[in-house]
Amino acid sequence: MNDLLTLRVEKLLWRGRGLARPDSGKAVMIEPGVLPGESIAARVLADHKDYTRAESVEILAPSALRRPHPCPHAADCGGSRFGVLAPEASARIKADMLRDTASRSLEPDVLAGLRVIPAPRGWRYRWRGQIHVRNGRPHAMGHASNDLAPLTDCHLLSPPLAADMENLARSLPDGRFTIAASPATEETFTERGRGGLILPIPDFDLDLRVPPGTFFQANWELNQTLIREVVAALDGFGRVADLFSGAGNFALPLARRGKTVLAVEGSSAAARCGADNARRLGLAQAEFRGANLARPASWEPVRHFLPQAAVLDPPRTGAKDIGAALMSISSLRRLVWVSCDVVNTLRDARPLLRAGWRISDLVLLDMFPGTWHMEVIMVLDRPDA
């Protein structure tokens, strides 16, 4: 299909795709890379019954918000499409995307009360990232393709990680790998490396120590705000379940504040890491368990724990059927749901919302500037709480 359309982008949808409504009436969904208000020439990729899918081939009239992308690899790399926006504009557009996406699930007053926390820096914020290695050199995935583009720098990576990226790649075979740097020491690692990263959480006078391949929040600076928000939302609740806990990003600060915490994590290695951190820090009130919460039997210890509240931070794919499992815990009064994909979260939270659980706070953190991704906190209270 080589048909070209002249379109005006009405708004951005989830995942950064543009929406246009030409005179024909059928909606056109445009691949990421456009901004609201822009006029574009677009190539049709597929024509479906209810909508047409297209990609921009030329920006005819750019948005006033568009600015030059600072990265020399931007034309080939698909990892930072929002890099043409200033951080403040990026946060506003993400808030609009969130409100639009959630409008079919959440009440208008909840969306009107959305709090937006911008990123403290727009670039050089990631202390963990992924690279594709080919012939000992770092590469990035191309725009909506499996093509690999060579990298000499990445503006998303923290300075020590970006500076050592090429050296780290030389130690790896072909494939996709996680690389990371310690915010405390700036020492760099590949996921195959020995040693460990020190991840300070200064507001709670503690640090996490994790092996190089362990997941942690890449934007460690804004993660401090995320932790503060979660801990504040759980003020007044003494017994807290931390579900999908990782190595203790929330469990250990909560324990430091005197909570009794049961942390449940699907990765047994991450759960052991969390337990090791708790012992090292003298936080005996934090218990870590390795268990797959997709299995009904894994919920028995959680129910037996009698949590008054829970924080959950599931993977991007969500946690199917978790709503029913949570509602089966009669002691629960509050949920603090941390989400990196609100579409999946709203799907999973639907049983709770239908049962009358109410959202008392909704927060967007621009955890991933330069990209369409965001982190969202949703606080839900039991209707009879």
Task: Label the model's feature ranges.
Residues 1-73, 145, 288-289:
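Terminal RNA-binding accessory module
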Residues 41-43, 130, 241:
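Hydrophobic beta-strand signal
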